[in-house]
Amino acid sequence: MYVELKNINKTYGDYKASDNVSFGIEKGKLIGLLGPSGSGKTTILRMIAGLEQPDSGEIIIDGRVVNDVPASERGIGFVFQNYALFRYMTVYDNIAFGLKVQKADKKYIKQRVMKLVELIGLKGLEKRYPSQLSGGQRQRVAFARALAPNPQLLLLDEPFAAIDAKIRTELRSWLKDMIEKLGITSIFVTHDQDEAIEVADEIIITNRGRIEQKGTPLEVYQNPETAFTAGFFGQTSVIDNYQVFNHFEEVPGGEKAIVRPEFVKVTKKNEEQKYKSSATEGVVERVAFRGSSLELKVRVGDTVLSARRSLDEEPVREGEVVDVFVQRIFVTKGNEAVLLHNTAMVEDWLVI
C-alpha cells in the first residue's frame, strides 16, 4: 500500500473526529472520502497532509511513518475548497509560488509552469489575475499550483464545492482524466455521492469518525456492508414495517427496511398482471420531471417511497391510485444490512 492509516484516533474536546481509523490506498489510485458533514473525512485528509496531528496511530506514506514529518516535507500537494489563490499574483506566479519557495532554477520554473498551464487548458492566460478568471479556471490554477512541486500524493478538500453545477460536471471529468494521465495517487473529500461515483476508483464511507466501508463505487452501492452505508448511499426510503410488502422473508431481529428507487416499479392500476400478487396499493403524492424519466413520490400506508417511471410509459398523475411493486429491500439488523428479494418476482425490473 502506498498510503496507510493504522489505528488513527483524533479528538477535539468531547468530539471524536477519528475513531480507530485504518485503511490502505494503492499507488496511482484516485480515492473519494465520502460522508455527511461532521463524519471526519476532512480531518483524515488534514492529518495525512500534516496540517493536523493524530492523538494516536500511524500515518505511512510510501513505506515511511510520517507522523513527525513536517507538512512541507511529506511530498504532498493540497487543493483547498476555496482555491486559496493569491489575488495579487498572476496565473503564472500562483503556479510558480511553491517552486520559488523551494528556490528552484528559474529556467526549470518557467518550463514547469508552462507545461502545467498547457495541461490545465489555460495557455495564453498566464498573465491574468484570479479576479479575471471563472470559478472553473481558478480551480484549475489551484490544481496546477498543487502539482507544480511534483508531489507524490495529491489531496483535494471538496474541490468542486464552490463551482456552479454545469462547470462542476465538466471539471469532474477533467480531473479524472488528468490524474489518470499523471498517475499520481490522489484522495479527495466530498459529500456528493454522484461526484464520488463518477470520479473515484474507490470510495471510503465515513460516519461519526469511523470507516463504514471501502470499495469500488459499484461494490459499495450494490453490496453495502452496514446499515449506515445502505441508507446513506443513493436515494433511499426507510420503512418501519417492511411486511407491508408481499413476498419478503422475515429476518429474525430485523428492524427497518431501506428501499431504493430502482427497487420499485409503479404502474397504473391493474396495468401489470404477471406479478399482481406482489402489488401493494399506493397513491402518487408528487411527480417531478427529471429529463429522461419522471421521479415519483408514492405513499404506501405510512411510508413514502421514491420511484422512477419512463417517459415512454403512460404518465401517472398526483393523487392517482397506483400499483406498487417492490423487488428488493435492505433490512437492517443492528448495523448490518441484509438484502432480501421478492420471492414472487424475477430480476427483470432491477436497474442499477
Predicted regions located by residue number:
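ABC ATPase nucleotide-binding domains
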Residues: L30, A71-Q81, L85-E225
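The feature captures the beta-strand-to-loop junction immediately N-terminal to the Walker
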Residues: L34-P36
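ABC ATPase nucleotide-binding domain helices that frame the ATP-binding cleft
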Residues: T42-L45, V141
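Helix-to-loop junction immediately C-terminal to a conserved catalytic motif
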Residues: A49
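Conserved ABC transporter NBD signature motif
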Residues: G57-V65
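Non-catalytic connector elements of ABC transporters
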Residues: T236, H247-I352
